[in-house]
Amino acid sequence: MVRTTLGVVIGTAASFILFTSQAPKIKAAEDVCQGSGKVANLDFTVKDINGKDVALNAFKGNVILLDFWATWCPPCKKEIPGFIQLYNTYKSRGLVVLGVSVDDSTSDVKKFMTQFKMNYPVLIGHDRDDLLRAFAPMPGYPTTFVIARDGRICSQHTGFLPLEQFEKKIKALL
């Protein structure tokens, strides 16, 4: 009787440990969008790297990773390869990655894009104080926003953040 009871207790404990120690589940979108839940102002038309007008509100209904960056910014250079990877992996599920360069020189941005093999849209934001104010405060670069399909800003981060942390948020929103 003692052995049977002990076996049941050990088996139950082992099962509990096994099932609760598995990889954490992806959080629901509501858990990811903690904070103010401010709706992103996407009512802007911005020029892309080739001078073409891009209406940000055309991306409503998608999960948007909006990254304000510069070619001279070391943490930006470190993050961009991860954004390329995220874009390649999740664009078919509704992820849009938009880079907003704050550089003065479009030719420098084009060289940078070629060097880093950037394949997502890059917009020119250096002369767009209205756009920068809409997403303020931005204490530095990179400043990256993750925006849910319903337009809520789910996170804002300034500085380098590992790919895995962005991916966790994005997967929960897709």
Q: Predicted regions: what is each one?
A:
Residues M1-V9:
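Bacterial N-terminal signal peptides that target proteins for export
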Residues V9-I17:
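Bacterial N-terminal signal peptides
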Residues K25-L56:
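N-terminal "domain-start" segment that seeds a small globular fold
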Residues V63-I64, P142:
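Alpha/beta-hydrolase fold active-site loops
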Residues K77-F116, D127-R133:
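Structural microenvironment flanking redox-active thiols in thiol-disulfide oxidoreductases
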Residues F112-N119, G125-K171:
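Thiol/disulfide oxidoreductase modules built on the thioredoxin-like
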